[in-house]
A protein has these predicted regions:
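Short, charged, intrinsically disordered terminal tails
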Residues: 128-143
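Mid-protein regulatory/catalytic core that forms ligand/cofactor-binding pockets
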Residues: 16, 22-132
């Protein structure tokens, strides 16, 4: 996976440039970029990149709000779904990136507002943020 910090770019800028580059580049050029990055298997948002033969890795994850019960559930952020630019900027500033280990501290009855703690950040995610983060249960998540 290519983390946004490897290029020292925020998600919002990375997304805009990646879309433009992909749309305007030849397959050969894109293959060379992938090779120079050691053939990443996931994009910066944690989404699987198809193999040359078209295979896409399946994931066992769920939206964060679907994992919000029980309280204190340890989770590992696996990916960020497509989201509006404002949501990506909000998340980028708070660091809940793929492979981040976190704990769900509290949530509303509808699981749409979730309080999360990780080593890098703790705070509240409103529906826009909680709805685009995907995670899996993890027994070694941050306290």
């Amino acid at each position: 996976m290519l983390p946004p910090r490897r290029l020292d770019l925020p998600w919002s800028e990375l997304a805009a440039n990646a879309d433009a580059l992909e749309a305007s580049s030849s397959p050969r050029f894109l293959q060379r970029i992938e090779a120079s990055l050691d053939q990443p298997t996931h994009d910066p948002y944690g989404q699987p990149i198809p193999t040359p033969d078209g295979h896409i890795e399946s994931r066992r994850d769920a939206r964060l709000r679907e994992l919000a019960r029980p309280r204190w559930a340890p989770v590992r952020i696996t990916r960020v779904a497509d989201a509006p630019l404002e949501t990506l900027v909000f998340l980028d500033e708070r660091h809940p990136r793929p492979d981040t280990r976190s704990r769900i501290q509290a949530c509303t009855a509808e699981n749409d507002i979730i309080k999360v703690r990780s080593a890098e950040w703790h705070g509240t995610l409103l529906p826009a943020g909680a709805g685009v983060l995907h995670a899996s249960l993890h027994d070694e998540a941050a306290r």
